[in-house]
């Protein structure tokens, strides 16, 4: 169904969410209709933030907000749903629009499989009534479901529309770009060159896919890399855990701006721990590129200042490959925690592949390699 008609059925004037490729039609519609507007549309750091922000909107207006998200974000909403929204607490009504990755019976990437299996069960456990929208679902069926949901919403309960792949359509094309000339895949190529045989923990999305293909192109082993294919926002904490246990080995984390924002508190712990053998690189294109390109707030904030305030003893931002190479060499030689922000353009190769090894194989090979490290 057309996303414009879906929005009319929802009849909401405030949306907040974390972008999802399954919801690209809705995301593009919201950007085309509202852009980023605190009164009507906010892209928040994580799904729990969205839920709290939407709760504040309801408290101020008495109206019902919409929170959109990928099903991988269900874990982030459990706490505010259970201890803030629930009708045994504050009874705050909300409409969740959830992209269903990893739906049973439909091929998807490994990080989505289990989440897809438990998506509906988690909603049931949270007491959230849901309606699944597929390609063949009619507007009349969605409208009837929304009308039925009004009873729950009027009682301060929460409801959800679970969106299958291709269920929503939007004809208007929205392009996302910035003026940064550097290309993420080339940035990662430079990191691989500088890091040598040091272990790398890479963030979810296209960065890990590009790292995998660079190793393939170079004829190098994948044992050096832990590809954090899911678990968005946690790669730096994984890298910290490795670095603390392997103090004689330089550990590199290749992170993204959307991931850093999602769980930014990890930077405070990382800076306070200050492992001398870790390099934290954030490739900042100011966008959730892997799921469509919608903007993050990272273009508006000073990540270097944040890193410094969190206790990183060395923090820099680079905008050219020459600057990047210089800082990578310095980080390699330095016995101190280093933070490098790399300003990056939006975009990737059309033929970018996916890892051909399984997640378990990746883990086993990485762990075997770490046994050789000090």
Question: Locations of the language-model features?
Answer:
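A contiguous, mid-protein "functional segment" used to position or interact
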Residues: 333-347
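A short alpha/beta connector and helix-capping loop motif
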Residues: 81-82, 91-94, 264-284
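Active-site flanking residues adjacent to catalytic metal/cofactor-binding acidic residues
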Residues: 163, 254-257, 283, 340-342
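DG-centered beta-turn motif at the end of beta-strands
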Residues: 69-72, 249-260, 265-267
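Phosphate-handling active-site elements
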Residues: 245-255, 274-277
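A short, acidic, amphipathic alpha-helical segment used as a generic capping/interface helix at domain edges
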Residues: 150, 320-333
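Thiamine diphosphate
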Residues: 1-124, 128, 132-238, 244-245, ...
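A contiguous pocket-lining binding segment that forms or flanks enzyme active sites
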Residues: 278-311, 317
């Amino acid at each position: 169904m057309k996303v414009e008609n879906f929005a009319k059925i929802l009849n909401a004037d405030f949306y907040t969410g974390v972008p999802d490729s399954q919801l690209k039609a809705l995301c593009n519609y919201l950007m085309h209709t509202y852009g980023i507007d605190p009164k009507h549309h906010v892209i928040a750091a994580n799904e729990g933030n969205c839920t709290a922000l939407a709760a504040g909107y309801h408290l101020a207006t008495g109206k019902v907000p919409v929170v959109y998200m990928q099903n991988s974000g269900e874990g982030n909403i459990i706490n505010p749903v259970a201890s803030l929204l629930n009708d045994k607490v504050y009874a705050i009504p909300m409409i969740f629009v959830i992209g269903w990755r990893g739906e049973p019976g439909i091929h998807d990437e490994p990080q989505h499989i289990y989440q897809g299996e438990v998506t509906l069960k988690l909603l049931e456990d949270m007491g959230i009534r849901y309606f699944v929208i597929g390609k063949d679902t009619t507007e009349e069926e969605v409208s009837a479901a929304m009308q039925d949901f009004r009873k729950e919403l009027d009682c301060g309960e929460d409801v959800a529309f679970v969106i299958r792949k291709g269920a929503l359509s939007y004809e208007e094309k929205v392009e996302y770009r910035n003026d940064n000339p550097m290309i993420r895949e080339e940035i990662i190529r430079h990191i691989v060159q500088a890091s040598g045989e040091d272990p790398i923990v890479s963030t979810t999305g296209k960065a890990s896919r590009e790292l995998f293909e660079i190793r393939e192109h170079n004829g190098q082993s994948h044992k050096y890399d832990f590809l954090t294919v899911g678990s968005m926002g946690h790669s730096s904490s994984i890298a910290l855990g490795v670095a603390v246990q392997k103090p004689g080995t330089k550990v590199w984390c290749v992170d993204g701006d959307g991931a850093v924002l999602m769980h930014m508190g990890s930077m405070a712990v990382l800076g306070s721990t200050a492992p001398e053998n870790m390099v934290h690189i954030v490739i900042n294109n100011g966008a959730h590129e892997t799921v469509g390109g919608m903007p993050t707030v990272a273009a508006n904030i000073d990540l270097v200042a944040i890193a410094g305030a969190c206790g990183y003893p060395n923090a820099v931002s680079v905008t050219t490959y020459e600057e990047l190479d210089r800082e990578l060499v310095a980080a390699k030689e330095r016995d101190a925690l280093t933070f490098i922000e790399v300003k990056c353009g939006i975009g990737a190769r059309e033929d970018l592949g996916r890892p051909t090894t399984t997640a378990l194989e990746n883990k086993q090979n990485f762990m075997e390699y770490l046994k050789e490290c000090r």
